[in-house]
Regions:
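Extended, hydrophobic interaction surfaces within ordered domains
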Residues: 143, 219-269
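N-terminal secretory signal peptides that target proteins for export/translocation
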Residues: 1-29
Length: 554
């Protein structure tokens, strides 16, 4: 078992009783001093010998991550045997300090689904991850869909555990050896996704077996011991999970079964007791979209852009952060004023140039106001005409709600709390057997994800979408999006009731026109919204600030 729920009860430490005070005799003091000196000498000698031994066995060069994984697969039974395992069920006894606390059942199914059920005297805790979402159902009986680092780590571990680390590249998992742990004689392999999820797996240099998993996002360390045969492969029969301060739980394997035909629905979140009409809710959300875009042009705001360059091993080679003040203007693109780069404000000279450029942009926007409005109306009419023509020919490229309703099925609609507001949450995936008739449907049919909707305001609170399969245009000659491309968007509710963008994350690997393209990892954050009518005359630019330290001039 490599996936269990992290919710554990805190355990109070026992305080030892005090020892009686006593005064040693002088002769006894000399004997104790001699014994202490002798023990210290032995300790120094043994420590030096141990250090020399460890130094001797420490490799001069670290093997590749793939070689370490291959050795692990060979040690537990070999790739051919592991490849035959489509699903697995493990039954456990749960101990807390050698005291039976409950029982557990964990299940895995390829390519990337896991589920754990922990049953205690006071209730049940269930957690799971599938290709679309990660979720928990705690002792309070309330469902909770994970987000951000916790969700990413859960989905990454599900992809690794469900396949026993076999063919991790097909799951778009990156791997690299980060260190050699001398104390435990283990190689530390970091597995990661381009979205930022990271887990460290420790493999013994002697047995080649997995001995530990370190998870910083969920603040847990899982240790594996007592490997014995179950069927045709080796499985750990003792697993210790330490969540840091909440008491370490021990899981003892009682039974393991394979290929019993576990249904995909076993890994879906529990749906709400009442019927939720997701299609009707999405149509209402769509009707609010035009109004939302119009209101968005009434606010200036700060925009923070973070771009990362990630290599094939998952290492962040370069990170660039830029912050802008943005002034939306009707019927044309917004005016963006650069404020800082990598946390350093623009210098006086450069800030003055940027201020001048922005003022010239405002002046141009004011001069061309009527012309821009006419161009915008013409663009809208042309776009509407093309959409109608493409829809008639069955080749509409615009992704809209009607397309999602045709292509997707909505899984486990449920009610949760999100950002201190009520939310309707549901997973989405392509309808089984759906055949796309245009590029829009082709793209949607390859997406999976999860959506949070505010049922009162009929607004999307959060949207996560990932490409389960690659997407190509022109047979891959024009555009080739690789599987695993991910998109996350969030909106926030202002005091006056309008919803505005809060965050956007894009992670994708794309090839354009055979030779162009690359890997893109970007996060955009919006904040400090200020309401204006959107006219140029309403904006007031602050004078450029003198930098604190000219040496930090970007």
């Amino acid at each position: 078992m490599k996936q269990v729920n992290r919710n554990q009860s805190a355990v109070a430490a026992n305080t030892p009783a005090g020892l009686p005070r006593w005064r040693p005799r002088p002769s006894l003091c000399r004997r104790v001093a001699w014994c202490v000196a002798f023990c210290v000498t032995l300790f120094c000698i043994s420590s030096q010998a141990q250090q020399e031994q460890q130094t001797a066995v420490a490799p001069k060069t670290l093997p590749s991550a793939q070689k370490i994984v291959d050795s692990y697969l060979k040690a537990i039974g070999g790739k051919k045997r592991i490849a035959t395992i489509r699903d697995a069920t493990y039954e456990w006894q749960i101990l807390l300090k050698d005291r039976t606390l409950g029982i557990a059942k964990t299940q895995t199914k390829t390519p990337s689904s896991v589920r754990s059920e922990l049953i205690f005297g006071n209730g049940q805790v269930v957690s799971a991850a599938n290709p679309r979402s990660a979720w928990t159902h705690g002792l309070d009986g309330k469902p909770h869909t994970l987000t951000d680092a916790e969700a990413a780590a859960a989905r990454l571990q599900a992809a690794l555990d469900a396949g026993h680390l076999l063919d991790i590249k097909k799951s778009n998992v990156l791997s690299r050896v980060v260190s050699f742990q001398t104390a435990g004689q283990a190689y530390v392999v970091e597995f990661s996704l381009r979205s930022g999820a990271r887990l460290r797996y420790l493999f013994s240099t002697t047995t080649k077996l997995l001995v530990s998993i370190e998870d910083d996002a969920r603040k847990s360390i899982t240790r594996f011991e007592d490997y014995r045969a179950e069927g045709n492969i080796l499985e750990p029969h003792r697993v210790n999970i330490d969540n840091g301060g909440t008491g370490e739980l021990t899981f003892l394997l009682q039974r393991a079964t394979y290929n019993t035909g576990i249904a995909d629905s076993a890994f879906d979140p529990p749906r709400a007791a009442e019927a939720l009409d997701v299609a009707a809710l999405l149509r209402e959300v769509s009707q609010n979209q035009d109004q939302l875009e119009q209101r968005f042009n009434e606010y200036s705001f700060l925009q923070r852009e973070t771009s990362r360059e990630i290599n094939s091993k998952g290492e962040v080679k370069k990170e660039t952060v830029k912050e802008f003040e943005v002034f939306p203007i009707p019927h044309r693109e917004a005016v963006m004023k650069l404020l800082s780069e990598n946390g350093v404000p623009l210098s006086g000279e450069r800030a003055a140039k940027e201020q001048k450029r922005v003022e010239e942009e405002f002046a141009k926007a004011e001069r061309d106001k009527d012309k821009n409005e006419q161009k915008d109306q013409k663009r809208r009419a042309e776009r509407k005409r093309k959409r109608a023509a493409n829809a008639k020919e069955g080749d509409d490229d615009d992704v809209d709600v009607s397309g999602f309703l045709r292509v997707c099925e909505f899984v486990s609609p449920r009610r949760e709390r999100f950002r201190d507001r009520d939310a309707v949450v549901f997973d989405f995936r392509p309808r089984p057997g759906f055949k796309a008739s245009n590029r829009q449907e082709d793209l949607i049919s390859k997406l999976v994800g999860v959506v949070w909707i505010d049922p009162a305001d009929k607004q999307v609170m959060r949207l996560e979408a990932r490409l389960a399969e690659g997407f190509k245009m022109g047979g891959g000659l024009l555009v080739n999006l690789r599987p695993g491309a991910a998109f996350v968007m969030e909106q926030t509710r202002m005091v006056e009731g309008v919803w505005l963008p809060r965050m956007l994350q894009v992670n994708l690997s794309v090839k354009v026109l055979l030779f162009g393209g690359g890997d893109y990892n970007q996060t955009i954050e919006w904040s400090d919204y200020k309401h204006f009518s959107g006219d140029v005359g309403d904006y007031k630019l602050d004078a450029p600030k003198t930098p604190i330290d000219p040496a930090k001039k970007p």
